[in-house]
Amino acid sequence: MDLRLGDSREVLKDIKNESIDMVITSPPYDDLRNYNNTLKWNFGVFKDIADQLFRVVKQGGVIVWIVGDKTYKGSETGTSFKQALYFKEIGFNLHDTMIWHKPNSFNFGSNNCYKQSFEYMFIFSKGRPKTMNLIKDIPSKMAGKTLKGARKHA
């Protein structure tokens, strides 16, 4: 395993073409965080990184892209979907989409909108994925059942 830490715009330049099997990342989006005033994350920066990812990911490789959207003036930005569509535009397949529920978040927000307590996990593949291990649900004895009475769980 080769783990790299740094600014993706710089780190990706040093990686050989079609040499990466898998990328897992949750990049900044919609300027929700301040990174020491060093990076203004915008669609141009995203496109540069996505283009480099297409160059370095092998045929059959995958990217797990975890991203959300900011709500601004009562409307979600749609950044996550714009990014997903751009990945498709440059040649990746949108293999799967999952929802990641963020722990310790509340579902209520302000301004007549629910707070985003989740992010999208887009799974992109370059061609057909070489390996895929589907997540299997853990069976629950209580699934589909209702409890009656005043019994409380402690």
Q: Residue spans of the language-model regions?
A:
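Core catalytic lobe of class I
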Residues: 1-154
